[in-house]
Amino acid sequence: MIDQYKHQQLQIGLVSPQQIKAWANKNLPNGEVVGEVTRPSTFHYKTDKPEKDGLFCERIFGPIKSGICACGNSRASGAENEDERFCQKCGVEFVDSRIRRYQMGYIKLACPVTHVWYLKGLPSYIANLLDKPLKKLEGLVYGDFSFARPSTKKPTFLRLRGLFEEEIASCNHSISPFFSTPGFATFRNREIATGAGAIREQLADLDLRIIIENSLVEWKELEDEGYSGDEWEDRKRRIRKVFLIRRMQLAKHFIQTNVEPEWMVLCLLPVLPPELRPIVYRSGDKVVTSDINELYKRVIRRNNNLAYLLKRSELAPADLVMCQEKLVQEAVDTLLDSGSRGQPTRDGHNKVYKSLSDVIEGKEGRFRETLLGKRVDYSGRSVIVVGPSLSLHQCGLPLEIAIKLFQLFVIRDLITKRATSNVRIAKRKIWEKEPIVWEILQEVMRGHPVLLNRAPTLHRLGIQAFQPTLVEGRTISLHPLVCKGFNADFDGDQMAVHLPLSLEAQAEARLLMFSHMNLLSPAIGDPICVPTQDMLIGLYVLTIGKRRGICANRYNSCRNYPNLKVNYNNNNNSKYRKDKEPHFSSSYDALGAYRQKLISLDSPLWLRWNLDQRVIGSREVPIEVQYESLGTYHEIYAHYLIMGNRKKEIRSIYIRTTLGHISFYREIEEAIQGFSQAYSYTT
């Protein structure tokens, strides 16, 4: 379909019977209206021409050959004379044969039929709106039981039966024959509702706004009750609250989309264009046909049988009519979803029929096979690798992909900045990879997000926005924390990169799709950007340290030389390397020693720490207290060391740690400070 902005789009939803007729009906010059498929036949066995009013009728779906009618007459398609658009003899329109790819027909059902997607789907929309159990609705649809229509203006047989139960008991011998008389048809049509018609009546009587109001009132009452202490009652109350929320959302959606609930029950069944369900003739008189045609034939045959019985309702038993209605319902269910009734329907060769749902869904379905996965402009594709130096909202684009994606923007800026005079020279500069090209490319990329997508896109986190940066090589660099949303890993997975062009698309990418704004799962609300796999192993290796314990070095290693740089490469100090643990006054000194290869990531060391009240006020008992000749002392604990003067004042604190712990702590501290600055800026 085409919207008001002339954008082509595909929309799946409910339509009214009037819209289905409008898709199919055509008015012939003689006043006849064609569009209804009434016969299950396809092609004539002698002439191999489509049967009139059949599933391949040329009057309904258009000519097989462009500009040639069923009679063999021809006329140039698109001629100006409207009186000659249709053949006066056969009624076929002189148009291009491609019309058979989109011209639809319809089957007028003799009884209403529920749409199986909305009845048996999870959740069941029909059961949700009617607030009734699904099993009861299924029993009503398939004729297992009926219900009495409410009637307030006049007494009915069913109502009087409750008032005169004793009198009726004495007349049982005369009441039973009544149900086999012609008068029962009138009684049934007036007072008894069964099948999908009963569902349609109930849906038509619904007031969606009242449903929303009543559901909201009931939800508030359940919310005010709180917990009763009974686990079973609390569970039922919780399930009921979830159901009420879902019911309100569904009713609101029907109101917003201008869809009537009774449209979930079909009175007209659309017939697909014949080119989408072809019949192919092969050598040796072999015919290959789509399963959809066979399912349509079954629907038409059963529907015609039901229409015949309804015309002779005075002679047809009520049970036979109800049984035929059930057969029509099952035939339509099989057409829409073959496995909806449990075991899928099979043909004479024990092969499962492929229904409309089977044609649409899955990897080989119409959408993913034909419509999706095609090449589009301003896009690229490459293998993803880990980018540990990237921020959460960044991705690394190879130079080749970046220059191809942003080529038009680079050409525009080259001409605007008078670095070149025309497009041809600008393309030559790009091809020759001049330095000014990379400068402009980085400037363009700085303000333009890109979209990364990994197939299959099963939820909205399968495509996210990132700020691109240039990287060497031919792979896309990705922050490891965003992999869970994409369900990606770095074992050869590929991702596609797309460039949003319009200002609306760029604004949506920045406001809604950036990776740092999608930290929680949209389904359950749990954090989705959490360390996994390689990150956990790296953090473990970084912070494991050497678990030799403080007692291995008599607690006081190098205490007299706080900033001593130990030469581990000197063989004479091998004993010193084993026993002595260096002291550092700051983390920068420790990092400097690591860069000089004096210590390793997991080597224990003593780091001077700020006076911390948590340490000072701790009730932990020191392992050992050492006093020196000048009156100073050292209180040695399991993981820290307190140095004091002769006045019992704490002079400094050293903690026992490793360089891996220091690096991890600094990263967390910088992240918290950056978050605090960003939060204060936004507020």
From Swiss-Prot:
Entry keyword annotation includes Zinc: yes
- Amino-acid positions noted as binding Mg(2+) in the UniProt annotation, renumbered to this chain: D489, D491, D493
Sorted alphabetically, the keyword list is:
Chloroplast, DNA-directed RNA polymerase, Magnesium, Metal-binding, Nucleotidyltransferase, Plastid, Transcription, Transferase, Zinc
Cofactor binding description: Binds 1 Mg(2+) ion per subunit. Binds 1 Zn(2+) ion per subunit.
- Give compartment(s): Plastid, Chloroplast
According to its UniProt record, the EC number is 2.7.7.6
Query: Which cofactor names does the annotation list?
Result: Mg(2+); Zn(2+)
Uppermost EC category:
transferase
MF GO annotations: DNA binding; DNA-directed RNA polymerase activity; magnesium ion binding; zinc ion binding
What is the name attached to this protein's record? DNA-directed RNA polymerase subunit beta'
Gene encoding this chain?
rpoC1
